[in-house]
Amino acid sequence: MKNLISITFLCFQLMFFGQESTSSSELINGINFQNELIKNSLVKNLEFSNIGPSVMSGRVSDIEVNPNDPTEFYVAYASGGLWHTINNGTTFNTIFDNANTQNIGDFDVDWNNRTIIVGTGENNSSRSSYSGIGILKSNDNGKNWENIGLSDSHHIGKVKINPNNPDEIIVGVLGHLYSTNEQRGIFKTNNGGKTWEKKLEIDEKTGIIDIDIDPENFNIQYASSWEKERASWNFNGNGSKSGIYKSTDSGENWELISTKESGFPSNSGVGRIGLSVYDKNTVYAVVDNQSRRLKEKEVKKNAIDKAVFEKMSIKDFMKLNDKLLNDFLENNGFPKKYDSNEVKELVSSGEIKPLDLKLFLEDANTVMFDTPIIGAEVYRSDDGGQTWVKKNSYYLDRLYNTYGYYFGRIHVSPTNKNQIYVYGVPIIKSNDGGITYKSVDYQNVHADHHDLWINPKNPDHLINGNDGGINMSYDGGKNWTKLNQPNVGQFYSINVDNEKPYNVYGGLQDNGVWMAPNNSVESARWHQTGHNNWTSIGGGDGMQVQIDKRNSDIIYTGSQFGVYFRLNKKTGKRNYLKPKHDLGESPLRFNWQSPILLSPHNQDIFYMGSNKLHISLNQGDDWSFKSIDLTKGIKSGNVPYGTLSAIDESIFKFGKLVVGSDDGLINLSKDGGNTWALISKDLPQNLWVSRVVFSKHKKNRIYATLNGYRFDDFKPYVFISDNDGKNWKKISDNLPLSSVNVIKEDPFNENVIYLGTDNGA
């Protein structure tokens, strides 16, 4: 299997800066150039050992099962390729290594002729969703792949093959994630992909996310459009162009059926829509309704909710019960220096306003989980989509939270039109046509679900794909088995310690932080011994890891948006390390993958980046210093932006620091952060600084990698300076087309450097 390193960050917007996205011709030429380089590579015969982990797997995008033999099926992973099993998931074989991408949105199989059609480019539109190269076709179970078009699509929503005519294929194209483009909508081929015709076009911001078809009549098709705009600082995943279309002539012509008169939502709050067709009459849809709820959630009696501070007067604030205010401060993690007396004094003196208590708590995680939107709604039509009725009798809380763009799927049982499954963070099941629900994912089922197959001959037989891999049930979801043999986890970062054998640590997308000895061998034997070489040491989206060189039991790691801990592996004790701003100050902004660093000169000194550089002299127990804002500043939006993305310290001089930001700045300090010099004026502007590192061979040498992925710009940007950033030289002109995420200098030979990109190393 190809060794791919995916280091994931937030997203940039094309229109704001005018950055050019990569054209389809550049993309194809880049692939050809990369293939030529591989043929002539000095290390092409170098063997890599797979050390795991497979105890957890990676994000599934699609599952297709042989209708005549359910022990044979294919699984597509968002950035892990396509895998095949013929023994009910006991083992899998990768069949996508000969493709020129590992990123998949959806696929379909013509089981009669064993033809596989893959739509490349994940369709979930998340921070870690990578683009594809169009539609790929294989007639020999993945030994060879042919690109059959739509190379400027970037992300594919759905692929459907006519089971009675495999040359007829319908594709829902979602389009570019971070820029507008024309290759969106519904495309159809009648000759197996030799030529394509666009059958439905909405606009350059709206693509097709789902297609489902009457199981008895391929002529009757339903498709859902999705209007969205993504930028580094904002994601608008909804719009009035999101809707449901129907075709009665096999996709040749389409009609919008989610009109205001139909009963289906048609306002600007409509987000991603998932579809499931039972027969010619009954159709289900789940919609991510981003409209605000009319009524806020109820607050517990005898408790203060942060929302009350939004419009509270100083006079009313001073009347607050001291015990209730102290409980509020303690329960919400305010620094100990703030008690009711201190806070009331600050408000009375005018140093802060009551609103500041609410703002103090509003970081990126609260926005993601606590914003009071309607969320997932289930609709049903019993007249072929002419009219729709909302079925859920209560809010489906915590199914989507605020990020329904990441899910958006629904399935109806092939044998019971009143039994449906809806999935987001959990899977929920309804046996009464969507009125009431119960959860059916249990202890050994990972959260965040993306696909579900229901056996038409045995509807209690389910195969589920989620962020942690594959699960199977034979009792309608009461019990599940894990099928996690593929090693397809998506790493944000890796690090190693100095033990013998040394341990490898890694933070993974939605799979936490794991560690294992470097000589680990992937084997099913752990099912017998009960011991897996890989150990979980953190949850959430696993982020960066730093290891104390004096004592490898001391680990610094954490999850998204700056939630970091110092962990003692021996005792299990965890110390929370995230810096806080003071009441009345502008809130700190933390990157999704906030950078951390232990000083090479003193392992008690811990650096962490928000929009400022924070320095602790005692392992993060408190923060003795914070810098000025080292970014271009805050930008209005619902995603933290203007944050630090990279930190390094020179091994030649204590306190010589360099930091990079997500909005394209690189700053250098030679006095421990007291003063800073901007050194990126002559570099390409506004690109994400994925890495900025000092050389370990030359004291004034700095390397910088910039990443245009968030502009849909996939060119490599690698620069070197030999005078502390006064002048830069580009050294990436002879590299293949791929965004660069990480750079490492060889510890023994200054002329050898290593790069990790979106398409390999």
Model-predicted regions and their roles:
Residues 20-761:
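Beta-propeller blade termini and top-face loops
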Residues 1-24:
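Bacterial Sec-dependent N-terminal signal peptides
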